């Protein structure tokens, strides 16, 4: 049931009333946790129960499972991308810390993305907008590190994303191994003058 027309690249606006906003956030928090733990087997009724709200309240905020999934996905992408704006004075550290955060996001949100692909094609507007958001956040970090002479000049941001996407597919049951591979991969980006 793939459809690109129903997808919007931005999440529904959070409600303005304090109680409605609280319920909205409770639902998102419960859904984030439920999808991380149970994946596709998670029912909306279970999410409402975990959030401490009625199913009608959940549907008022999120009229379908797809809308809830899209909102979670967009919010998570924006959260990881916002961290890029909290730059460190050290361009290498700024890039590497952000890449490690993106790996953490990609690794833990794999199930969420797979669930969304039941509703959307890979080239849906939602995914395209999220890719643009990731590029807008990460590309300046790479360029800054290259200008500082700490990252190889032949590296494109698309190379970095491909590298991180590959690492994110590693089994997540050994975080130390994932961290080790991330360090090796990031070390491969470093500029080393020829002797």
Language-model segments: what does each one mean?
Residues 52-62:
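Short hydrophobic/aromatic patch on the recognition helix
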Residues 103-140, 165-173:
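Short secondary-structure transition hinges
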Residues 1-41, 45-50, 67:
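Basic, helix-initiating cap at the start of DNA-binding domains
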Residues 129-133, 147-162, 171-176:
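All-alpha amphipathic helical-bundle segments outside canonical DNA-binding/catalytic cores
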Residues 1-11, 97, 104, 136, ...:
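C-terminal peripheral helix-coil segments that are non-catalytic and often amphipathic
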Residues 43, 81, 111-117, 150, ...:
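Short, hydrophobic secondary-structure boundary micro-motifs
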Residues 62, 69-76:
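Alpha-helical DNA-contacting segments of helix-turn-helix folds
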Residues 71, 82-108, 122, 126:
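Hydrophobic alpha-helical connector segments
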